[in-house]
Amino acid sequence: MLGLDSHADISCAGRDAHILAQTEGRTCTVHLFNDSYDPMTGIKIINVLYKYENTEGGQYILEVNQCLDFTVTIVRSILCTNQVQHTGIIVNDVPKVCNPTSSQDIRVDDGKTVTTLEMNGPIPYLPISKPSINDVEYLPRIKMTADDIDWDPHKIFNQPHLSEYKYLKQDFDISYNIQGVDIYHLPYHHLKYLILLI
């Protein structure tokens, strides 16, 4: 399962991810929501691939670049909504039960490719599986997040003009924020993580 998270600052790769590459020279420190736990250090940043099959039976490879490497420790993967939208992809994640006019999907290439979002309770998601070598080689690929710029949402979205955007420093920290909606649930050892790039 590749769950969408609009409060996440960066995507997280779980066990269904096929690792494409590791981003050299960049690691993260992940702080738990509770100060009594030690932070997780040296978390790698990787580019990964997932296999996705839409409701019509079409199969694709989803390429998610610049995500945290939890491929050994978590089952479900997380897709940062704004990280996807920053590439120009349209994310319509309002559930139809809340708004019957919602398309509840992700639209790529000006709507030419549509991936329908399913719901797991309140969480929109894409059903995924780990791709085989044959899948990786022959299935059409959709690039969900960019690999040509360093992902730093605070610099990107907090700048008054996007032209002022600067590349992310080599090492950065993932920290926590205990104010209300910034709570970010990461299913690792059943603990809650609050992830914010600083």
Pin down the residues of each PLM region.
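Acidic/polar residues in short coil/turn loops that connect beta-strands
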Residues: L32-D35
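Catalytic histidine site
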Residues: A8, A17, Q83
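A glycine- and small-aliphatic-rich helix-loop capping segment at beta-alpha/alpha-beta transitions
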Residues: R15-R26
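Aspartic protease core domain of the pepsin/retropepsin superfamily
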Residues: E24-T29, P39-I198
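Short hydrophobic beta-strand that contains or immediately precedes a catalytic carboxylate
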Residues: L2-H7, S11-A13
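Beta-strand elements of modular eukaryotic interaction domains
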Residues: M1-L2, K96
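Short hydrophobic alpha-helical segments that form membrane-spanning helices or hydrophobic packing faces
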Residues: C12-D16, T87
